[in-house]
A protein has these predicted regions:
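Short helix-to-coil transition segments within interhelical loops
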Residues: 145-151, 155-175
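Transmembrane alpha-helical segments of polytopic membrane transport and secretion proteins
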Residues: 1-19
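Glycine-rich helix-loop "coupling/hinge" segments at transmembrane-helix boundaries
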Residues: 116, 145, 192-214
């Protein structure tokens, strides 16, 4: 009963914070403190959402498709990279610095180059999403593999287990927690990456919609 009351109280605080935020937002916009073209009021946002709902869904479908494809490829590439870096020290030393370098370049700087090289279709968007999502996946999985219990690994080796068996029964299960934490980060990255690339060139998508209605 006490725990249930705590959950209700916690949710009430969250709802109250959202209500206060919306109220302040409405006041700032209605009073003209912030111009409406910079910060439309919540009511204007709801009205625009209802009015443009079919068009929004059409553009959202494109953005979500790009996000899904890019995230899927990012997870696959990140998984393969993590496995190779875990198994081969030479690959780790050669590939890890390149991974870090790709993450130091701002996304907004990479996107125009990808659009220039690949055109205005889906390819540059998916490529950008892969670039921004595979790194968290690869690092999360690699840390998970390396956090596997050493005693268990040594025991399996003593019993004659090969690398694949050790990976499937010890390393992979121990990496799942970090994998899902990294996946949660990558999901947010994939949507942001898709919208940014659509801003800079494209025919459909939420980024294109935002540019047109600005």
């Amino acid at each position: 009963m006490k725990r249930k009351l705590q959950n209700i109280t916690s949710k009430a605080y969250s709802v109250a914070a959202i209500v206060v935020l919306l109220f302040v937002w409405q006041i700032l916009s209605s009073a003209g403190i912030v111009p409406s073209f910079l910060l439309p009021s919540p009511l204007e946002v709801v009205q625009a959402f209802v009015k443009d709902f079919p068009l929004l869904m059409e553009h959202a479908k494109v953005t979500l498709t790009e996000g899904f494809l890019g995230l899927t490829l990012g997870v696959v590439i990140g998984f393969v990279a993590a496995v190779l870096m875990d198994h081969f020290q030479g690959f780790y030393k050669a590939f890890y610095p390149i991974m870090v370098i790709t993450q130091t370049i701002p996304t907004i700087a990479i996107a125009p180059l990808l659009v220039l090289w690949m055109g205005y279709e889906m390819a540059p968007k998916v490529t950008l999403i892969v670039i921004v999502t595979f790194f968290p996946i690869a690092i999360g999985l690699l840390e998970g593999f390396q956090s596997a219990d050493k005693d268990t690994v040594n025991l399996l080796k003593a019993m004659g287990a090969n690398r694949l068996q050790i990976f499937l029964h010890v390393k992979f299960p121990s990496s799942l927690g970090r994998f899902f934490a990294s996946l949660r980060i990558s999901v947010s990255y994939c949507v942001v990456g898709a919208v940014i690339s659509e801003w800079l060139g494209g025919y459909n998508g939420l980024g294109v919609y935002m540019t047109r209605v600005r």
